[in-house]
Amino acid sequence: GLESLTTGQIDLAGFDITRMHEDMLAALRRDHVGIVFQAFRLIPSMTAIQNVAVPLELAGRADANAGAADALESVGLGHRMTHLPDQLSGGEQQRVAIARAIAPRPQILLADEPTGNLDSGTSEKVIATLLGATEAAGAALVLVTHDLALAERCGRVLTIEDGMITDDRTTGLKGDAA
C-alpha cells in the first residue's frame, strides 16, 4: 500500500489493496498497519507523546494522549514523554517510533531495518522492545533485515533476491514474523 505494484495483487484484511484508491489505502493503513522505519521519522517540533499521539488523533480517538502515554510506557519511555526528538538518543527515538506504530493496536506491524542505524547494544534493546510490543499487541510482524541472526529470531523467514522469493522456511519459533 506504500508502493505501486507492477504485477500481482496484495490482499490485506480481506481487501485487494491493488484496486483501492488512495483514500481507502490511507484508511486501511491507519486502521490495520503500523510502520517502523529505519530513519525514525519523528516530527522534530513535537514531544515524544505528541509524536505517538498523531496516528491516534488521525483515527479520531478521544483518548489519543492516554493511548500515547500507554504506548510510551510499554516501550520503557514513560519518563521521556515531554522530550523532543533531539533530546533523545537514537535508541530512544526508535522506541518512540515503535510506540507510535503500536499505539493504534494494528494487526500488522511493518519494520524496515529498524536497527539499521543503531549500535549493537542499542539494537538489541530496540529489537527486544519491538518483538515484545508486537507479541503484547497480538500483531503480526513483517521485519525487513539484512541481519541473519535477527531473522532467525522470527517464526518464518523469507529470503528475497532480485525481487523474487528464493527461500521460505519456518524457524520453529513462535510468531508470524518474516
Where do the PLM segments sit?
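ABC family nucleotide-binding domain
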Residues: 1-153, 157-160
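H-loop (His-switch) and adjacent beta-strand-loop-beta switch element
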Residues: 157-169
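ABC-family P-loop ATPase nucleotide-binding domain
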Residues: 166-178
